[in-house]
């Protein structure tokens, strides 16, 4: 669905205003994963696009569905209409669900729509203030994020912790996953209201993130846990900055990565030793070739040496690669060098030519390719 074209066709907004709403809509999925709130962007329809009296659709709504980000024409609720009239953030209740609604203003200061956050009915009254802080911070991120920054945002899971703190380092919000993670790390005090520095988190880069307003990611080790810490600063105004701190337990991923590195090192060592053994065999055959006085024996031994060295070459190349894949061109170039050294006399002028694209193949296939090139 072309969201921008739909906005242009059904609302009085111009291209620049449409581009702004379309830009904000790119963060709906990310925003919902952080807030666990339903996020909708709305703007008034053209009068000719409004539904009949029975449906009375008067707003174009941009939201997430199973098909992705879509637009649909809806009847705006009282909170939405009030926002369009006075342009101030509002808290409303629609269908027994709490909504936090914030204005979207274009460069000319005109209110062109709003962002609505619908809070889950399971949220308790004592959590309302924190939920509003969460909505307020998220809507500022949606309004201020650049295209480059949006590309770096990835939805978080239910198991990821989320903390919001301000430029005075006071924690304003912490979701349940964050409380559990920080508790595991040994922080036994109330999270919200305390200083981010009083926690057990390793957050030495906080001031730099707040001052420079740049995204920062690090992996920190806490005893037997590895936590990826992703900080996203948000400019709430000229003199206020808040920061999302996403905590992701990547202990399992880190262990798997370490295991892969160990396995890769072992594989490279095996290839290196196989190469040495093959070269030893080739050396023994070369000694036998020197001792023999029969030309046909020398030729047979030399052919065997070439085959063995072609296989040793593959293992040598793999032992220097981080992956168990080799470029055919690399095999060809090295094999031609060996063949030139062992078979081409100084008075001969032999040219080797490679034509075609280079291809990556597994070390298993590379052994066959090297033998084929050797025979050719």
Residue ranges of model-derived segments:
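Histidine phosphotransfer helical core of two-component systems
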Residues: 279-308, 321-324
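Conserved phosphoacceptor histidine of two-component systems
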Residues: 265-279, 283, 287
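Sensory modules in modular signal-transduction proteins
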Residues: 20-39, 139-171
């Amino acid at each position: 669905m072309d969201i921008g074209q739909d906005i242009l066709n059904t609302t009085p907004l111009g291209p620049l205003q449409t581009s702004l709403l379309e830009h904000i809509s790119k963060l709906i999925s990310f925003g919902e994963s952080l807030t666990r709130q339903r996020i909708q962007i709305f703007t008034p329809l053209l009068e000719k696009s409004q539904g009949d009296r029975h449906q009375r659709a008067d707003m174009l709504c941009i939201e997430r569905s199973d098909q992705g980000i879509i637009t649909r024409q809806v009847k705006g609720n009282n909170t939405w209409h009030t926002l369009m009239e006075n342009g101030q953030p509002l808290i409303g209740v629609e269908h027994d669900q709490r909504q936090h609604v914030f204005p979207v203003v274009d460069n000319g200061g005109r209110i062109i729509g709003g962002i609505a956050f619908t809070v889950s009915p399971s949220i308790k009254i004592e959590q309302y203030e924190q939920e509003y802080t969460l909505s307020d911070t998220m809507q500022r991120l949606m309004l201020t994020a650049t295209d480059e920054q949006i590309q770096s945002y990835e939805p978080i899971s239910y198991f990821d912790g989320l903390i919001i703190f301000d430029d005075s380092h006071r924690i304003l919000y912490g979701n349940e996953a964050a409380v559990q993670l920080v508790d595991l790390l040994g922080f036994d005090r109330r999270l919200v209201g305390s200083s981010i520095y009083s926690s057990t988190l390793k957050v030495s880069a906080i001031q730099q993130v707040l001052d420079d307003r740049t995204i920062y990611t690090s992996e920190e080790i806490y005893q037997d846990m590895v936590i990826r810490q992703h900080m996203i600063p948000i400019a709430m105004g000229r003199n206020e900055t808040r920061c999302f701190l996403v905590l992701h337990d990547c202990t399992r991923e880190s262990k798997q990565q370490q295991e892969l590195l160990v396995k890769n090192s072992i594989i490279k060592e095996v290839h290196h030793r196989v190469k040495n053994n093959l070269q030893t065999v080739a050396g023994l055959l070369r000694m036998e070739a020197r001792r023999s006085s029969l030309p046909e024996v020398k030729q047979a031994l030399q052919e065997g040496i070439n085959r063995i060295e072609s296989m040793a070459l593959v293992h040598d190349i793999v032992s220097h690669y981080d992956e168990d894949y080799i470029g055919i061109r690399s095999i060809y170039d090295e094999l031609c060098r060996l063949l030139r050294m062992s078979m081409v006399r100084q008075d001969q002028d032999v040219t080797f030519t490679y034509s075609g694209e280079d291809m990556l193949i597994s070390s298993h296939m590379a052994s066959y390719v090297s033998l084929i090139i050797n025979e050719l």
